[in-house]
Amino acid sequence: MAKVRELEEAFVQEQPSPQLPSEIAEECCAQLLGKGLLVYPEDSAYLLAETAAGARSSGEKGGDPGLQVGVKSEMQLNNGNFSSEEEDADTQESKTKAADPQLSQKKSITQMMKDKKKQTQLTLQWLEDNYIVCEGVCLPRCILYAHYLDFCRKEKLEPACAATFGKTIRQKFPLLTTRRLGTRGHSKYHYYGIGIKESSAYYHSVYSGKGLTRFSGSKLKNEGGFTRKYSLSSKTGTLLPEFPSAQHLVYQGCISKDKVDTLIMMYKTHCQCILDNAINGNFEEIQHFLLHFWQGMPDHLLPLLENPVIIDIFCVCDSILYKVLTDVLIPATMQEMPESLLADIRNFAKNWEQWVVSSLENLPEALIDKKIPILRRFVSSLKRQTSFLHLAQIARPALFDQHVVNAMVSDIEKVDLNSIGSQALLTISNSTDTESDIYSEHDSITVFQELKDLLKKNATVEAFIEWLDTVVEQRVIKMSKQNGRSLKKRAQDFLLKWSFFGARVMHNLTLNNASSFGSFHLIRMLLDEYILLAMETQFNNDKEQELQNLLDKYMKNSDASKAAFTASPSSCFLANRNKASSLASDTVKNESHVETSYVPLPSSQPGAIPPALHPFSTEDTDNMPLPGQIELSQSTGHLMTPPISPAIASRGSVINQGPMASRPPSVGTVLSAPTHCSTYAEPIYPTLSPANHDFYGTNSNYQTMFRTQSHPASSLYAHRAEHGRCMAWTEQQLSRDFFGGSCAGSPYNCRPPSSYGPSTHTQESHSMQVLNTGSFNFLSNAGAGSCQGSTLPSNSPNGYYGNNINYSEAHRLGSMVNQHVSVISSVRSLPPYSDIHDPLNILDDSSRKQNNSFYADTLSPVACRTTVVASNLQTQIPSSSSQCMYGTSNQYPVQDSLDSNAASNREMVSSLPPINTVFMGTAAGDT
């Protein structure tokens, strides 16, 4: 009690604030003593540490300098900026210094707060130097905290706890959020919206991996016990990275950027289809996509396939596709894979080269010669990784069996490694090769001794992989870099001695009748396979670096080429949806890229076309005057997509759900017509010959707006004025003689043979057929299925096979837009015949079919085009009526009544992609 009284008196005497009453001071002292926060040495000396309001260093006080500080203010305890680890450290430090009077005095609270503020500033600067705001990127929280601990260790700072560090991060990145990602039972918290800068030292450790292969460091992801078998469904929605842009390429010669951009976009869509089918397990359909793309290449794009720059860009795109396919098909976590999936991947790798070679027939040899080596490396890597995973799955149970491991250790202990190392083959040195003895027999003995130690430690497959990474890195890669020797030569020397030493070990096990011979043989096969995989990975990385250098040569901006080549595949769950509005023109391919399209006609025949269409000459297009409000087209070529493959015509995907959802009758199985329409002509699209295997034929001289024919035009229509494609036709009554014959009776001739040169423009003006490019309807579009002579207003419905489905013009994206969707995630069967060709159920109404002539005997010039029968029209169809289909009847209802059925008709046949389709970074509203 005397000691307590003495301390209380000292507290009152040393009170720094005279305004504070002594009663309050005594109460504070009692509280400090009661809470154990007042520490004093055994010699009863005491020195009060000041509070935050009037704190000053203990050295400034007039007391004994040997006395120690023993007060920890409650402000420090209640401050959230200090962690529990710091409190424990401070308490331990106080006790230690109090016990030893010779130690330096403890820092005051003010000094500690200054240090803490300085450390926070250093941490914020470190965050700025190594991390960046990146929308759509997730970073595991544990990895970020591990980086912080490494930073504190290097800077000799006391790290804060994870919660305090989280507050510091949000000071730098206030919009940062957290998400819990991962499979059930193995989910972890991730920071969403932050990524590691490429200039950071942590970038390669996270995104590139520290090891030599994709499986290096995978042991961290297998912690936690039970893991499910790998399934491709977990990769659903994976999108390809961006391909090189045509705008950044440096071309050689005169090449249209629009054509190059179209070709690259087509190829990316093709590659995305391959990726989607691989994820869905439809490996056999990939062959059909290859044939469809390469053999259906439009003629006007074929010359690009001979350009060296385009060929090299294709090689870069192939490398990107192969890396994504490898990441999707084979898990880097060494997760157990079903046997059926392994078999499918092996079969896919076996047939891939044959599929690609067969699809490239009759194409430039330079393209084939460049693509084959890249695909062979991909096939070799795919086979090697599947083989390694298969062996790892078999060896894992053996390594977990303690009895098997003990038997292997016991048997290998009986092998004399020194006698094997002293055999003649390993001691032979080639005098001409001074580097041949670098990997000596001593190294072989050391390596196998390390293997023996791993077995004794009950090492897992992941531990063996980590060990092999170290062996190959230290004894092959590092040595080749230091001595300047070829990596290939060094790898060959290592593999030779590794294989020989392993074979001699197995020889000794055989002679000793080792009971664990089978298990050890399995482990050796696993190690051999991984070493080969590590070597091949290094060689493939060198080849990819060559492709990167090649891309840098062709790209104007090296950063853009690096971003395109090193980008990782993204997921639909991480896609940046906020950029949809700005990227709408990039993700939807506009095949004309302009709002007007013209056809060049001879200047000597300007009067043969309607007055609303202005001919122009092709000789001097730069100085050509503009008639009226019409603008010149900037399109330099006929940019069309390849035709629909007959092999996928029955697939209900977004590729063939648009206005081209029919197959040519001459390829594959032709859709059977119903009995009441047995005389329906076979060619669905009459302008094609039966020999053509695509909708666009093989002529490179066709126009996207006007298609020249060798016969008189058979139909005229008023085009959509709001799109600005052409001026409206004058509303004049055209006689029957204007058409030159029946619109349904006269056959169409085939297009002339293909050629790369410009059109001769020798067709007569009356041999011009106007097509409705707003929608490629083959049966009843406004150009081919509307009544001759009838004038349709600009707001006339442009239905799908006769449907009066009205879509807002904002969603149609112009009359020359063909939307390309990269991800196909919906498959359905082909709709019934009646749903496609007769959605309005016209064929079932016998009253609409009348067996009369195509043209009425009256003077009315209106005759409706039909395939089988015609109607006797006594009255003219008003401009608000729909297009005719198969046959006509009385007047159609007005537009207002048709709009009421738009919703129901849209459900029957829709040209829009399904809702569950994942688009390339665009929202559904952009389609």
Swiss-Prot record:
User: Mind telling me which GO cellular component terms the entry cites?
Assistant: nucleus
Q: Name one GO molecular function term.
A: DNA-binding transcription activator activity, RNA polymerase II-specific
In the UniProt record, does the keyword Cell wall biogenesis/degradation occur? no
Residues annotated to bind DNA:
123-198
**BP GO terms, sorted:** glucose homeostasis; pancreatic A cell differentiation; pancreatic D cell differentiation; pancreatic epsilon cell differentiation; positive regulation of DNA-templated transcription; positive regulation of insulin secretion involved in cellular response to glucose stimulus; positive regulation of transcription by RNA polymerase II; regulation of insulin secretion
Region: Disordered; residue ranges are 1-21, 81-108
Tissue specificity comment: In the adult pancreas, expression is restricted to the islets where it could be detected in all endocrine lineages.
Effects seen without this gene = Mice were born at the expected Mendelian ratio, but fail to feed normally, exhibit gross bowel distension due to small bowel obstruction and die within 2 days post partum. Some, but not all, of the animals also have reduced pancreas size. pancreata had almost no expression of the islet hormones genes, except for PP (polypeptide-producing).
UniProt xrefs under InterPro entries: DNA-bd_RFX, RFX-like, WH-like_DNA-bd_sf, WH_DNA-bd_sf
Look up keyword Transcription regulation and say if it applies: yes
Keywords on this record?
Answer: Developmental protein, Diabetes mellitus, Differentiation, DNA-binding, Nucleus, Transcription, Transcription regulation
What's a Pfam family this protein contains? BCD_RFX
The subcellular localization recorded is:
Nucleus
Q: Which domain of life is it from?
A: Eukaryota
Induction details: By Neurog3.
How would you summarize the oligomeric state and partners of this protein?
Interacts with RFX3.
Q: Which family does it belong to?
A: Belongs to the RFX family.
Q: So what does this one do?
A: Transcription factor required to direct islet cell differentiation during endocrine pancreas development. Specifically required for the differentiation of 4 of the 5 islet cell types and for the production of insulin. Not required for pancreatic PP (polypeptide-producing) cells differentiation. Acts downstream of NEUROG3 and regulates the transcription factors involved in beta-cell maturation and function, thereby restricting the expression of the beta-cell differentiation and specification genes, and thus the beta-cell fate choice.
Q: What is this protein called?
A: DNA-binding protein RFX6
